[in-house]
């Protein structure tokens, strides 16, 4: 299995995580171990890497690459939403760094059998974790027109969402939509020809929306940030790399909330809540990949990196 996932902004990530002085760092999106290998090779002799990935293929690929490190690497086939529980299961109550790289890997995109890509014909699946019951095919063939439109509009930010949902419901009355290219055909028919002449592939936003919904990605991200912050030791760092505006908005909002001191209503002249910030923002604006990195790895183009540092002492 060639699970190729070129690690994005790896130098900036390592600089922020500071693994050389860490006891424990968690890579919540281990994948092909691109970031994990760099982290584990930078850890001190007693340092531990905890690698997590919900995709069984990604887990196996990462595990095989990290096996040589013995007990220095603890790897789990699980969702990063369970980050705190996973660490506590192995007796780790605090960590020094957490990384979430939310990009879909080249392997997942290029392996047509996974159903993530609109470039190849494949079963309409899109599950990161094959044990999940719901597939993209089930969503497309059973959800109401209104529900489909909401998903495509909210998670795909697609202005033709209502029309695409309408065309999907019409098409499935004649025959179930079970493959990626069957869905692409319906989407292309729904979007007016003039609107398809520029911009990304006409199916890109709808496929993104279905993938996010099928895998519960945004809810998992929000929960993982909240749980991960509780796990961080004082001065520990949380780095998140996102690849679309919905993810970035959630990370920005969650980090901003955690960095707030006073949460009193603005009409109060004096703070009554005595609130204290939980984190310090390390990136007031997101860091972006260099042009050189984008030329080497075009999929890095949309990446944005945000990071915070845990304040105080929780251990």
Swiss-Prot record:
Which residues take part in binding S-adenosyl-L-methionine? 33-35, 53, 80, 101, 108
Q: Which domain of life is it from?
A: Bacteria
The UniProt GO MF terms for this protein read:
rRNA (cytosine-N4-)-methyltransferase activity
Per its record, the protein catalyses: cytidine(1402) in 16S rRNA + S-adenosyl-L-methionine = N(4)-methylcytidine(1402) in 16S rRNA + S-adenosyl-L-homocysteine + H(+)
Q: InterPro entries per the record?
A: RsmH, SAM-dep_MeTrfase_MraW_recog, SAM-dependent_MTases_sf
Among the GO biological process terms of this entry, one is: rRNA base methylation
What family does this chain come from, according to its entry?
A: Belongs to the methyltransferase superfamily. RsmH family.
Q: What does this protein do?
A: Specifically methylates the N4 position of cytidine in position 1402 (C1402) of 16S rRNA.
HAMAP family linked to this entry: 16SrRNA_methyltr_H
- Name of the protein: Ribosomal RNA small subunit methyltransferase H
